[in-house]
């Protein structure tokens, strides 16, 4: 079942256009949106989150138009970004208090468990944390209100490999029940080999290829023929 689907999604700027974005994210799967910087990954996710107003097309969550979702339905979707989205004066504990106020389905037990699992210091201010610790705080927060869909915008791309691997294990556990899903954007192809079930390539605002991970090797030559410059691989 498609938990998320876009139909002819568009976002038009003077110097850049996102056009005809038709993507599907299935329950129980991790889908990667991949492209070089400036390809349209963040614009796509901005439209999904509502931060950017789409110019056209539809976004469906569990078959329902995103524009008509109730607040409760919207709380089933969690977003995490490459920069922490809370005031840097907040402590890690205060991030959790904010979540408990904002979300009726906030799971304090899960939050505390994730803090322990990810070795996050509850009483430290965000401004005192490393980039990796901030990313782990953002993701722990996103997972603690029991979303059905987690959308990550380059959240792991600038982290060191050890932290990335730790988070990849967490993401795989998240979708194990077959009812939840993850869409994440990245320009690092090694992440795909570890966890992605499906990879969608975007280039200059267009989707150029959508493949199962098992098909990646045989299709790789086609991707290189469609783009001007390579994606980073570690």
Task: Mark where each language-model region is.
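Conserved ABC transporter NBD signature motif
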Residues: 57-68, 73
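Catalytic Walker B motif of ABC-type/P-loop ATPase nucleotide-binding domains
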Residues: 150-154
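ABC-family P-loop ATPase nucleotide-binding domains
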Residues: 81-137
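Helix-to-loop junction immediately C-terminal to a conserved catalytic motif
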Residues: 49
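The feature captures the beta-strand-to-loop junction immediately N-terminal to the Walker
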Residues: 34-36
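Conserved structural motif at the start of ABC-family nucleotide-binding domains
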Residues: 4, 18-20, 74
């Amino acid at each position: 079942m498609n938990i998320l689907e876009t139909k002819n999604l568009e976002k038009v700027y003077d110097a850049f256009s996102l056009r005809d974005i038709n993507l599907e994210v299935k329950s129980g799967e991790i889908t990667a949106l991949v492209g070089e910087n400036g390809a349209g990954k963040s614009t796509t996710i901005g439209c999904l989150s509502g931060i950017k107003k789409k110019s056209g097309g539809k976004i469906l969550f569990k078959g329902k138009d995103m524009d008509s979702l109730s607040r409760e339905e919207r709380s089933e979707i969690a977003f995490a970004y490459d920069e922490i989205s809370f005031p840097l004066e907040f402590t890690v504990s205060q991030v959790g208090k904010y979540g408990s106020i904002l979300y009726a389905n906030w799971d304090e037990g899960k939050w505390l468990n994730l803090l322990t699992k990810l070795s996050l210091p509850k009483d430290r201010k965000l401004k005192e944390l490393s980039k990796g610790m901030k990313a782990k705080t953002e993701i722990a927060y996103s997972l603690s209100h029991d979303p059905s869909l987690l959308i990550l915008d380059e959240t792991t791309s600038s982290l060191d490999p050890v932290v990335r691997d730790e988070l990849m294990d967490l993401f795989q556990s998240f979708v194990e029940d077959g009812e939840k899903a993850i869409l994440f954007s990245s320009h690092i192809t090694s992440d795909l080999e570890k966890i992605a079930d499906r990879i969608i390539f975007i280039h200059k605002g267009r989707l150029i290829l959508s493949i199962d991970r098992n098909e990646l090797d045989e299709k790789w030559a086609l991707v290189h023929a469609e783009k001007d410059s390579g994606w980073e691989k570690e």
